[in-house]
Amino acid sequence: EETDGMERRSAQTALWLILDTMTKLFAPILAFTCDEIWQAMPHRGEEDGRNVILNEMNQPFADYALSPAEMEKWALVEDLRDDVNVVLENARNEKKIGKALEAHVVLYPQGDEGKQAMEKLSGFTTDQLADLFIVSDVEIAQGTGAAGVKVPGIQAAVSEAKGEKCERCWKHHIKVGADKEHPTLCPRCARVIRTIEL
């Protein structure tokens, strides 16, 4: 993503919070290793940068707590990802695809259960679902596919993704090569590279 892009900054923040917490947790056991990590990482203003042992253990981050509705939505995403992974594995076994990033996934909502599940997923774009499933493309359509085990209201099917492979993100996209400055990149990666080059 862009250097100051929200997704990139969010991922960096999450990774930093995990590193900060794990370094403090392991410090009594791996004192020298954790101290070396502590010396190399950035710190919050209230933390003592001299040694990891001189700092309080992190408390749960209330700012990042999810509401029950958000927890339910993410549980649904995890269950749906598990169902999609089963369909991907079957497609691999049938030699339809090699790797997950070569896949185009179609989700077929079925009946009221499917409609309710799709309403919970309405905050996600198909590009975000593709990122969560680690596939090239996701489409939502009418029809039938393999029945889900964990999310019975949504069926899924897999086919080979159309287009060329982007050499940066490895996703297959029909518009790889559309950007003359970056002929081997998909539009998203070409946009990101342009912002980095400025």
Place the predicted regions along the sequence by residue.
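Short cysteine-rich clusters marking metal-coordination/redox-active sites
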Residues: 166, 186-189
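Cys/His-coordinated zinc-binding microdomains
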Residues: 27, 170-173, 190
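Short metal-binding segments enriched for Cys and/or His
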Residues: 192-198
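Short linker/helix segments within small regulatory modules
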Residues: 175-184
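Flanking scaffold residues of small Cys/His-coordinated metal-binding clusters
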Residues: 161-164, 181
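Acidic, turn-prone loop/beta-hairpin segments
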Residues: 1-87, 91-113, 139-141, 146-156, ...
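A glycine-rich helix N-cap at a beta->alpha junction
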Residues: 124-140
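Short glycine/threonine-rich loop-to-helix capping motif typified by GTGT followed
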Residues: 110-126
